[in-house]
Amino acid sequence: VQTGPVVDATTLGASPTIYLNDWRFHIGDAPDANGTGTPSWARPDFDDSQWPVITTDKRLADQGFKQGFPGFCWYRIRIQVPAHANLSVYLADVLSTYQIFEDGVKVGQYGGLPPHERRLETTARAYPVPSLSQPGTIVVVVRVWAHPVQSPPGIEPDSSYVGHSAAIANLRRVYLLDQFHHEIQEIVHAGIDLVMGAVLLFVFLGQRRQREWLWLGLAFLADSVASAVSELQVF
């Protein structure tokens, strides 16, 4: 039994994308999630009627969920699609790794989930929606995991859309361009810290009694290394 939410993508026209805001939501993981088949919670015929409906434009803590819960959570939504449509689902800021299923088929994964955890910087991705010969409904499911230091996991505001594939590609392009500009700024910042740290250590070598130059130089170098390590997680 599925009672919603339902997004009507058959009305796409003047607005080439629709924000996926209302989802069925559940904390925890499917009991068969690490098996060889499709997890039961990812199947289109799974009864999600007892799952609460949440909105991604609000913090989970503001919707009755405790802050700081670690581990897994699941999102489910139904999308009505027209026949022979060229549509895609867009996911951007999802903390921190996830799998996405469309009608029970795993169509993508970002990062690594337990038992093979691999956390990455968030980024935007597009997942094509299956083309149907007749108008119908597909079920999109997102399984999300976050390390306890990053909890709570979940889909951030303004990070989930469905729409014409060309419009979704443009939305992703804009996100990646903004992300690129941010990364350039971080690299420049790391470079400045590196230079400052080296200069301060050089000054310390000439004034060994002034140990504040040593500590300040090491602080700049540490900040530079931390920024560099963070940027290496982006792809």
Predicted regions and their residues:
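Aromatic-lined ligand-binding clefts that engage carbohydrates, nucleic acids, or primary amines
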Residues: 51, 79-102, 140-142
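Short beta-strands within extracellular/lumenal beta-sheet-rich domains
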Residues: 69-82
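Accessory carbohydrate-binding/adhesion or oligomerization-edge regions at the termini
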Residues: 1-63, 78, 139-177, 197, ...
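A short, structured loop/turn motif at beta-sheet edges
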Residues: 48, 82-84, 131-137
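Alpha-helical transmembrane segments and their interfaces in multipass membrane proteins
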Residues: 164-188, 228-235
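Short structured motifs
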Residues: 59-65, 75-76, 122-128
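Beta-strand-rich ligand-recognition modules
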Residues: 101-157
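Hydrophobic alpha-helical transmembrane segments of multi-pass membrane proteins
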Residues: 189-204, 211-235
